[in-house]
Amino acid sequence: MFRSMIVRSASPVKQGLLRRGFASESVPDRKVVILGAAGGIGQPLSLLMKLNPLVSSLSLYDIANTPGVAADVGHINTRSQVSGYMGDDDLGKALEGADLVIIPAGVPRKPGMTRDDLFNINAGIVKNLSIAIAKYCPQALVNMISNPVNSTVPIAAEIFKKAGTYDEKKLFGVTTLDVVRARTFYAGKSDVNVAEVNVPVVGGHAGITILPLFSQASPQANLSDDLIRALTKRTQDGGTEVVEAKAGKGSATLSMAYAGALFADACLKGLNGVPNVVECSFVQSTITELPFFASKVRLGKNGVEEVLDLGPLSDFEKEGLEALKAELKSSIEKGIKFANQ
């Protein structure tokens, strides 16, 4: 969660915004790059990262319309300096010196589409962007939002391996929206404050590969087995719920931007040495037989400091864990195969 912060010189209105935002006063300079900054997720994500005082330089890149987004966001009176870059020739300039690269680039879901339907378009985009990251900012942390995350993270890993720059501690699939949804849905059925809720979500980032661990939720609430099953299903189908509600006019752009900003903030805190920063993310992992898996990870100055064990699972969660493995394995292999074509 974002921690409250107080900027003594801020106006009351600005203080109100920032208390709901991020953290800290005296912090190192950090350059954050958003690839796909002019898109449905990229624009609100750019706004949220502009509000984050951990960011000193905000570099916005897209294939079109980035100058306008940069000019708009750049007028906001917060710490970071904003630069806009557009087109292939500017990609290197956008990336140079980055501490953190966030990738929401690609096409959004439409009604009837699954995340895997996006593969043929978004896989190529992620491959090309990963080649550029390996060339211009190989030491940066990379937060992958572009779907299908279960495949795009392995694509990026393979591209980085080919370039000789791969560091498994620095590549993250952003699954935070699954956690955000699980928290919201759980609180809605429990007599608890949603701001105090935490629910680990493990596995992957599509359909049945999303496995919320409601047995480990805090604060604990006495929910029936049927309700836990319903909450699990709703968490898994949360993206589809939004796509259908928008009736062809978009996907989960605003909540995804919020979740992406949450995870980016956690990564920046880790880089800055804040202790005990733990978030769920889809990373290279040995906690199952699969090469990538989403679970709780401890973040630090080098990215992933520790991949945490799954902890005790209910019988329902154990069943879900076994059920998701085949689909997740297939998605991972699909990404690896694409990257090596």
Curated annotation (Swiss-Prot):
Keyword Transmembrane part of the UniProt annotation: no
Job description of the protein: Catalyzes a reversible NAD-dependent dehydrogenase reaction involved in central metabolism and redox homeostasis between organelle compartments. Required for carbon dioxide and energy partitioning in leaves. May limit photorespiration during the dark phase. Can convert 2-ketoglutarate to L-2-hydroxyglutarate in vitro.
One Gene Ontology cellular component annotation held by this UniProt entry: mitochondrion
Pfam families: Ldh_1_C, Ldh_1_N
Active-site residues from the entry: 205 (proton acceptor)
Record: residues binding NAD(+): 36-42, 62, 122, 145-147, 256
Location within or outside the cell: Mitochondrion matrix
Family note: Belongs to the LDH/MDH superfamily. MDH type 1 family.
GO biological process, one term: tricarboxylic acid cycle
Quaternary organization: Homodimer.
Tissue specificity: Expressed in rosette leaves at low levels.
Transit peptide (first-last residue): 1-22
Enzyme Commission number, as recorded: 1.1.1.37
List of residues binding substrate: 109, 115, 147, 181
UniProt name for this protein: Malate dehydrogenase 2, mitochondrial
Keyword annotations of the record: Mitochondrion, NAD, Oxidoreductase, Transit peptide, Tricarboxylic acid cycle
CDD domains linked to this entry: MDH_glyoxysomal_mitochondrial (cd01337)
Swiss-Prot/TrEMBL catalytic activity: (S)-malate + NAD(+) = oxaloacetate + NADH + H(+)
Highest taxon of the lineage: Eukaryota
Phenotype upon loss of function: No visible phenotype under normal growth conditions, but the double mutant plants mmdh1 and mmdh2 have decreased germination rate, grow slowly, are small, have increased photorespiration and die before producing seeds.
Listed PANTHER family: MALATE AND LACTATE DEHYDROGENASE, MALATE DEHYDROGENASE 1, MITOCHONDRIAL-RELATED
GO molecular function, one term: copper ion binding
